[in-house]
Amino acid sequence: MKTLKFLSAEAFVQTGPNARRNLHCLSYNLYPILFKASYLHEEASFLHDLVQTWPLTELNLRKLLGKTTDCPEDLTCSTCRLCLEAFLTGLRDYVLQASTTYAKILQVVDLIGIRDTEHQICQCRRTLGRWARTEMLTRVCYETMVSMQAGQSAPSAFNVEVDVRLDAFVTGRNYEVVSQALLLRRHCPLKLQFVGLRVDSLSLRNLFYLLKLVESHGPQKLEVVHNVHLEAPHIEVMLSQLKFPRLRSLTFPAQALNVHRLGLEDQDLMRVLGELMSKLTELRELYLGFSTLTGHLRKLLSPLNTPLECIELANCSINALDMAYFANSLHSEHLVKLDLSGHEVADLFPNTFRKLLQRCSSTLISLGLEECGLDDEKLDLLTQALTPCHGLQELKILGNPLTSAALHRLFNTLANAYPALRYVELPVPRDCYPESVTYPLDDRTLVNYDSDKFQQARTELVGILEREGKGHVEVCTPLLGVYDADINETSNELGVSMLSSFNNVIGSFIDTVNTVTQRREHRLME
């Protein structure tokens, strides 16, 4: 329930021009509550003025918009474009304009706490996603420098220095403005600090240049994804030339590591990469989905001296030898999040799979086993392996050929144990598809199921949880993938880049065919 203090703040920010005129009369300790009230009601003009005259040393969106004693509503999942644009322009004017009420003591602005979600709670329904926030903030930094150089700022602007912490997203479309802002960072009052960085649709040359620019920021999270053609030799250069002492999370694009591409001279490359990663002493999360690591997992992970807590090995083609190492490794006793999707664990390494879950049972929170060939006969392996994992919160088993009867058994097990469980990705039961289908399902077959039968099965399964007091557990079936705000925001650019890459491949293939044809014709003429 909102306090009287917050209700008063709401009433004040909605008085329009009067609120802006009377802002200078307010005590500095009212600014945080007014910030949340104006954000909640999308009072953009007032929000701009509030930021422009901010009297405190910190402006942290997670703290300001999260649950508070005055207002329990969590606004961190609202990336309202209207409010965030007002916030960023207000930050620019904080630097450029002379102070009228309080001294300029702002030291840190933290934008990391807001989350991009599929359904916006703001009234305008227009979002400013991570990519757009990155572009706008870097433009604000650049515009601030231009205004100062043109003499369009107060003298106090040259004495301002504010660290601006951001979880950035850079693609080819915003690369130029981002790199320009980073180059001017030492001269700009707004000191950009990329705590996290996601990179997509970028050439290797631009990627390495960008990473060099942010190296001094000490990023904690680096995601190189999708349309960045990064391979093992490039990763070796990246890790050997750049220093990221605070890096905690590292993501590589699909097929960045592929042991089948390694020549005889590169057979030791995985060990070299492991040794380079061992220098990242804070590394706790490693995402390698859709790489090919067959027989090389030990080389890659054994040099690490600090245990990984999150690892994605989905569709990495690991074999029994890899799993034997992993189940007995330093990492196995510290895993919080594990994804082994795409591996038929019951056929390839049932005993070591059980051992792995036994060793990480005290820490494991999330387990991904999508398309692992788990059918009714192999369900016992899963339930036995999960038995010691009392802290499990998430279970993802899409794409497994389990019937409704088997899922009833599984949900009874989940309902009677696992007190922390909160999220289950439920596969469409095998008996909801035609009898002739084979697994893994192709995209066309995937959505061709008996929806009425599925809804009935789902209702029964959710009912099992509800009867045991677990109605709060989210049960979903995202057949086309879980919503990804970053992909959704940049899907057009990603599609164009992928089409361009496809055209280049086809063009090269056609050139090769034409060359071969010309050679054959030349031989025939001879």
Swiss-Prot record:
Entry superkingdom: Eukaryota
Keyword terms: Leucine-rich repeat, Repeat
GO annotation (BP), single: negative regulation of DNA-templated transcription
LRR repeats: 103-140, 191-215, 244-279, 280-304, 305-336, 337-355, 361-388, 389-413
Keyword Repeat attributed: yes
Keyword set includes Repeat: yes
Protein family per UniProt: Belongs to the PRAME family. LRRC14 subfamily.
Descriptive protein name: Leucine-rich repeat-containing protein 14B
Name of the gene this protein is made from: lrrc14b
